Amino acid sequence: EGVAFLVRACGTSAFFSGDLNSWQWARPAEQNAASEKFFRTELSRIVPGPVDLAFVPLDPRLEDPAAGIAALMDVVGARALFPMHYWDASAAARALMSDARLAPYLGITHFEDVCELPDPVTPSA
């Protein structure tokens, strides 16, 4: 169990996915499908999209590590993307961005520990 947060403040929206994700583990396909459906249903509650900042798991241990970010961008969208939950596997996480579903978002994806975004971040509607 875990938490996820959507924060809107000062004209900027930030979504922290926390442990809410499309968890695609090595298990029966119907369990992974249920995880994907649940994640997309929860994401659909974020209206209006896109969010300005999104912090979403990109966990190399998963069978389909890109599923969560792909779902977020499909359902909600984000102006800046911050992968997380890759622990010490930064190189592996960066390599996962070559997934065809994620490649379009390379320009908005940030792996650095400190990131200065353009001022101001274009606020969401």
Where are these regions (language model features)?
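Divalent metal-coordination and catalytic microenvironments
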Residues: 19, 54, 81
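Active-site metal-binding loops of divalent metal-dependent hydrolases
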Residues: 18-22, 58-60, 85-87
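Core dinuclear metal-dependent hydrolase active-site scaffold
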Residues: 1-50, 114-125
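Residue-level detector of structured alpha->beta connecting loops
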Residues: 50-52, 77
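Binuclear metal-ion centers of metallo-dependent hydrolases, dominated by the metallo-beta-lactamase
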Residues: 65-125
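A short, acidic, amphipathic alpha-helical segment used as a generic capping/interface helix at domain edges
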Residues: 38-44, 61-71
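Short linear motifs at secondary-structure transitions and domain/linker junctions
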Residues: 28-33, 56-58, 84
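Conserved Switch II/interswitch segment of TRAFAC-class P-loop GTPases
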Residues: 53-63
